[in-house]
Amino acid sequence: MIINNQNSPQSINTPSSVSSRQHINKSKKKKENVIKRMLIRLSNSNNRSLATVFGVIGGLVLGIVLVCKEYENFPLVGKGLPLVYRIVGIFLSAGTGGNLSSYIGGTIDIITGDKTVVDLYKSFKRYFKKVKDKNHRSPIPLTNLNNNNNNNNNNNNNNNNNNNNNNNNNNNNNNNNNNNSGGSGSTDNNNNNNEPIFSNNNSNNNNDNNSDLEIPIPI
């Protein structure tokens, strides 16, 4: 185990060593701050600027790959061309990629209303969260649905039975009304039948009166 004495020359912090450490720390912080600022600016920038940056980087990488492979159909990169033309071809590739990406990013800005990438990411995240919540909601059990359907069917059957009972009651009332009308007809018949009875009584009375008359017998 090594113990550093305070009086040893290694443990003594000279002003030059302290300043050099501070300078290194400051330079690291500056680099981190620069990268952080660039990322923040890119995230807060519109889609056209962001797409242009990535398009230029992508076109540059594509141009370098095509030059290294000596792709003949790519302009200013074919075999036998000097190195200057190839470098120009790489820059043309980067510019073409940047222009195309700029058009695409501008179209996205028009559609989304100049929303940044962060805003688009948050909106997509909220949308997928809503969809996930809807899918994870507990569905209604099938037994409850079947019970509800059976109850509805029973209610319908009861309503039909009540309607049938009402119809039967109406029919019974109609039959009673018909019976009452038939009874009035029978009384008329009885009255009609009684009429000859009165006539018979009259004839009987006449016969009785005739029997009381004295008929003279001739001698």
Swiss-Prot record:
<feature type="transmembrane region" description="Helical">
    <location>
        <begin position="49"/>
        <end position="69"/>
    </location>
</feature>
<feature type="compositionally biased region" description="Low complexity">
    <location>
        <begin position="1"/>
        <end position="17"/>
    </location>
</feature>
<feature type="region of interest" description="Disordered">
    <location>
        <begin position="1"/>
        <end position="31"/>
    </location>
</feature>
<feature type="transmembrane region" description="Helical">
    <location>
        <begin position="83"/>
        <end position="105"/>
    </location>
</feature>
<keyword id="KW-0812">Transmembrane</keyword>
<feature type="region of interest" description="Disordered">
    <location>
        <begin position="135"/>
        <end position="219"/>
    </location>
</feature>
<keyword id="KW-0472">Membrane</keyword>
<keyword id="KW-1133">Transmembrane helix</keyword>
<feature type="compositionally biased region" description="Low complexity">
    <location>
        <begin position="144"/>
        <end position="212"/>
    </location>
</feature>
<protein>
    <recommendedName>
        <fullName>Putative uncharacterized protein DDB_G0285135</fullName>
    </recommendedName>
</protein>
<dbReference type="GO" id="GO:0016020">
    <property type="term" value="C:membrane"/>
</dbReference>
